[in-house]
């Protein structure tokens, strides 16, 4: 702030405020000067008395100037003995000189010799800076020149003048320290530590004299500590010298820039426990040394991941109301959000899905809590209520406010009566204040503008019209009651009366009393004339006397409102503040100590003018980035990231891959769970409209083969209405329709654990549809053929479902009321022994084994019958366990044959024995055909030991027939060559074809 602005600020303040600020500054000055004594103080009353005494001594009312010398002096503590100069080395090397310089700078040593005498004679003030002495011997100090003394005196005088100017400006204002303020002697002492000046009367010593001086310096360095101790004691005894030694002078240049000083020595800091300080000193130090934290860097645009939480004016706010976790668990079980969200007509966002997932997590937690509670492992403390995200995000309506008020009235109905009483009391007090103080206590509002002249004329004409019209019904009544003969006479008199009444009305408005008397007389006359007529009509109808309503009250009898008192704002505020019940207190009413404490409090900053400034930003820092406030309506999150160095994304939006995008490599065609084949015969086709097909394709592109989400989006309707079979949209039905619409669909594209079941289901459905000649697959209906057929099919399916339900209810077994129910015999029941239980288990296992054998035998007989008829095709589905090609002579293949899987094919376990036995079935075949068939039969029996020999021979014959003629001839040649030698030569690497090779060759044909 500039000096001009400060002058304006001080000029605008009153003298009382300036005196109060001066008192605060004096209290702070006293506390800072006594900071060393206040650390261990316990009696706060004594401190308050001392502060009051100090303020009384330096008050401006008594016209006493401030005596700076009377202030308490800041005396630093003595340096501990371990930090004193050690005298291990007797040589005055440059490193020791530097060390001594630093140690002597921290000590309170006053200048000795002639300098002490000069200081005592001058009586300098306390705030004058102390010159740091050089490390010199006693001889060099005595031989200092008079010029240095004169320069030192002149520099001290300049410093004293500057300090006086500084005090004259402000007690707290500080002048900038420049290099010119430092005395030249000090600069010379630091910059030239080795040069010694001699007086004019004394000549410079020779080389021999220099040697003697060096020897004397070495001798003096041994006794340096004792001399300094004596100097310290001398300084403490002299009050003036101690006053001058209260402050130290700091050199203008750093020590690293001085001549012959390259590196300073730093002693280790002694470790000590921090002493507790009084609360007043800590608060003052915190206020002085506290710096404002920068919560927002406006110029720094390269801030990465900087999160700022900005509050609104009404923060902190009330948290949203919570619900018990049991209620949320019940709602999640009855109406889960995962089922309700897809039925909404709005867009499906990530927040909605996260809300549903959080609800499921809460359900799991609640079930775990219930389990622990049953096991007596859960505490009896009530768990924290969870805020329902649905009710918290809904806007508050008038109905919600009424419900909240009703709930509050239910809790405490009598409190509403107290609230009404308090409101009435407040209104009564406001009325009393209005009639006591006048319009001063009223709220200042904008005055109502006076009406224009045109509006006044219209209003006056309307008033006259109403007055005249009020007489018209009386005239009509009189005319109707009077005879026709008297009508002419009465007409003129009535007109005159009307004119008189109008004149009387004008006169009465001006405040004349004659008008009122005339009205009274006319009213009496009117009553006398109409008494007879009213008596006749009173028996017939009850009437109202209008004359009494038109009668005007005498203005003299009107109640005149008393005049309001006129009071000034100062008087009103003074009377209001004199009340014993107040919410605030003025600082002037406190004592000096109380005012100092209240000003130094850091927590209660409402009394400070800086805190009243609403434009200053309030720091709000979250504990973590992952923690956000629960009340999101009153908090905003701003995220700043570095966007200067980042290049724009070169990948177009169409190529970006998200969680539900179908162009991701991890999104394969995974079919849903296939329905059971048991109900395939009773399956009805589903009808798909063109709009349904478009929505299906859109959902598939959006959710990437997530059939559960696709089904929930397709079946977006209420659960209460009836849905027929042809209108259902299950995940499998959506997948079926996708297979129909996709022309490039291939069964091999399906992946996942459910792909095999889906392939079987599609194959069986296609086969059944060809056999029954009835449609099972979904049916696409165009817009032209949908008018009647679709509706008819839907109603037909509805009636079919009703018929099945009625039939099922009729066929259900009904209890026979005539047959008595046998009582449950509990006495004859006996608990089985362990032996009986083991026998029952053995019998059950035996029955299961017998059933398995029967089923296996029936299956084998069925396969043999199919082989004999030639109906069983040679496919992997009918014979998936046929042997594979392997080396028949390898030992490893024999070992693998024992542990083979259905895809592995073990070789023959023995050598083939070629015999000359002719086949019994067909004599046209070669002689070695039987051996080939037997070899195949042995392979089949070796792989499937549960096969019978007949079934193996039939399978071998079928395999041989499926071979081409060239392969059969080659096999016969191989077997003929094998029959001659007993040992197969190693050069022969030909082996019999495996069933897998046979299948591949058959498929190639």
Curated annotation (Swiss-Prot):
Coiled-coil portions: none
GO biological process terms on file: chromatin organization; DNA repair
InterPro entries for the chain: Homeodomain-like_sf, HSA_dom, SANT/Myb
Annotated stretches, region: Disordered: 72-180, 193-214, 222-241, 468-543, 807-844, 874-930, 981-1005
Any Pfam family hit: Myb_DNA-bind_6
Keywords: Activator, Chromatin regulator, DNA damage, DNA repair, Nucleus, Transcription, Transcription regulation
Annotated Polar residues bias: 171-180, 198-209, 481-490, 874-890, 915-926
HSA domain boundaries: 386-460
Name of this protein: Chromatin modification-related protein EAF1
Lineage, broadest ranks: Eukaryota, Fungi, Dikarya, Ascomycota, Saccharomycotina
């Amino acid at each position: 702030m500039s000096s001009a602005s400060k002058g304006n600020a001080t000029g605008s303040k009153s003298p009382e405020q300036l005196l109060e600020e001066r008192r605060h500054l004096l209290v702070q000055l006293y506390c800072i000067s006594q900071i060393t004594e206040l650390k261990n103080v316990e009696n706060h009353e004594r401190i308050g008395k001392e502060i009051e005494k100090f303020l009384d001594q330096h008050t401006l009312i008594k016209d006493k100037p401030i005596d700076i010398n009377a202030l308490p002096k800041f005396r630093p503590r003595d340096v501990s003995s371990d930090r004193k100069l050690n005298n291990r080395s007797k040589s005055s090397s440059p490193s020791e000189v530097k060390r001594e310089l630093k140690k002597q700078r921290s000590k309170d040593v006053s200048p000795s010799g002639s300098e002490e005498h000069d200081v005592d004679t001058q009586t300098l003030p306390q705030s004058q800076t102390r010159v740091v002495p050089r490390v010199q011997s006693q001889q060099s100090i005595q031989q200092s020149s008079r010029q240095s003394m004169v320069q030192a005196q002149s520099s001290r005088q300049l410093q004293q003048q500057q300090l006086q100017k500084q005090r004259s400006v402000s007690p707290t204002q500080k002048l900038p320290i420049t290099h010119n303020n430092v005395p030249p002697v000090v600069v010379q002492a630091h910059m030239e530590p080795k040069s010694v000046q001699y007086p004019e009367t004394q000549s410079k010593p020779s080389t021999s004299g220099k040697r003697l001086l060096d020897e004397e310096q070495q001798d003096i360095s041994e006794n340096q500590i004792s001399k300094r101790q004596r100097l310290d004691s001398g300084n403490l005894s002299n009050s003036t010298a101690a006053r001058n030694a209260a402050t130290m002078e700091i050199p203008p240049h750093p020590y690293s820039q001085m001549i012959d000083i390259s590196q300073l020595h730093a002693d280790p800091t002694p470790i000590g426990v921090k002493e507790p300080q009084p609360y007043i000193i800590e608060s003052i130090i915190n206020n002085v040394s506290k710096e404002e934290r920068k919560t927002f860097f406006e110029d720094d645009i390269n801030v990465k991941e900087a999160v700022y939480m900005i509050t609104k004016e009404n923060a902190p706010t009330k948290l949203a109301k919570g619900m018990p976790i049991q209620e949320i668990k019940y709602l999640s079980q009855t109406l889960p959000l995962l089922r309700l969200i897809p039925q909404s007509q709005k867009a499906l966002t990530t927040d909605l899905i996260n809300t549903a997932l959080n609800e499921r997590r809460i359900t799991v937690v609640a079930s775990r809590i219930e389990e622990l509670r049953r096991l007596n492992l859960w505490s009896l403390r009530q768990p924290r209520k969870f805020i329902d995200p649905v009710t918290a995000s809904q806007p508050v309506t008038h109905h919600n406010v009424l419900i909240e008020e009703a709930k509050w009235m239910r809790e405490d109905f009598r409190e509403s009566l107290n609230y009404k009483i308090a409101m009435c009391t407040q209104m009564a007090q406001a009325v009393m204040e209005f009639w006591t103080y006048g319009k001063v206590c009223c709220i200042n509002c904008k005055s109502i503008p006076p009406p224009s002249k045109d509006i006044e004329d219209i209003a006056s004409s309307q008033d006259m019209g109403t007055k005249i019209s009020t007489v018209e019904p009386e005239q009509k009544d009189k005319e109707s009651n009077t005879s026709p003969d008297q009508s002419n006479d009465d007409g003129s008199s009535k007109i005159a009366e009307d004119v008189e009444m109008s004149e009387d009305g004008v006169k009465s408005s001006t405040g004349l009393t004659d008008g009122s008397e005339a009205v009274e007389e006319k009213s009496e006359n009117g009553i006398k004339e109409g008494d007879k007529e009213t008596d006749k009509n009173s028996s017939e109808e009850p009437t109202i006397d209008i004359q009494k309503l038109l009668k005007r009250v005498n203005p003299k009898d009107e109640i005149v409102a008393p005049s309001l008192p006129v009071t000034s704002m100062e008087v009103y505020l003074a009377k209001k503040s004199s009340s014993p019940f107040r919410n605030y207190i003025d600082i002037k009413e406190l004592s000096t100590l109380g005012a100092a404490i209240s000003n130094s409090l850091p927590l209660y900053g409402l009394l400070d003018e800086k805190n009243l400034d609403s434009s200053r930003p309030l720091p709000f820092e979250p504990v973590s980035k992952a923690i956000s406030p629960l009340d999101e309506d009153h908090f905003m999150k701003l995220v700043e990231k570095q966007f200067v160095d980042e290049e724009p994304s070169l990948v177009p939006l169409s190529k970006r891959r998200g969680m539900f995008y179908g162009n991701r490599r991890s999104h394969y065609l995974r079919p849903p769970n296939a329905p059971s084949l048991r109900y395939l015969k009773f399956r009805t086709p589903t009808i798909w409209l063109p709009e349904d097909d478009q929505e299906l394709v859109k959902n598939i592109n959006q959710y990437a083969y997530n059939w559960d989400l696709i089904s929930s989006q397709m079946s977006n309707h209420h659960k209460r209405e009836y849905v027929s079979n042809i209108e259902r949209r299950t995940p499998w039905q959506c997948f079926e329709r996708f297979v129909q619409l996709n022309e490039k669909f291939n069964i091999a594209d399906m992946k996942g654990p459910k792909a095999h079941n889906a392939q079987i289901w599609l194959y069986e459905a296609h086969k059944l549809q060809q056999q029954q000649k009835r449609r099972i697959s979904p049916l696409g209906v165009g817009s032209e053929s949908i008018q009647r057929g679709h509706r008819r099919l839907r109603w037909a399916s509805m009636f079919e479902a009703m018929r099945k339900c009625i039939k099922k209810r009729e066929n259900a077994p009904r209890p026979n009321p005539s047959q008595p129910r046998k009582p449950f015999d509990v006495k004859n029941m006996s608990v089985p022994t362990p032996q009986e239980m083991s026998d029952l288990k053995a019998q059950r296992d035996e029955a299961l084994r017998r059933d398995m054998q029967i089923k296996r035998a029936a299956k084998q007989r069925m396969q043999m019958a199919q082989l004999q008829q030639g109906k069983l095709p040679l496919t992997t589905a009918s014979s998936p366990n046929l042997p594979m090609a392997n080396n028949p002579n390898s030992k490893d293949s024999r070992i693998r044959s024992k542990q083979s899987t259905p895809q592995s094919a073990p070789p023959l376990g023995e050598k083939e024995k070629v015999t000359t036995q002719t086949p019994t079935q067909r004599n046209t075949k070669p002689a070695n055909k039987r051996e080939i068939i037997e070899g195949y039969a042995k392979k089949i029996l070796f792989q499937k030991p549960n096969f019978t020999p007949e079934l193996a021979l039939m399978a071998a014959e079928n395999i041989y027939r499926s071979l081409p003629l060239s392969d059969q001839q080659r096999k016969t040649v191989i077997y003929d060559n094998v029959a001659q030698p007993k040992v197969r030569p190693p050069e022969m690497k030909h082996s019999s074809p495996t069933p897998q090779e046979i299948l591949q060759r058959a498929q190639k044909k």
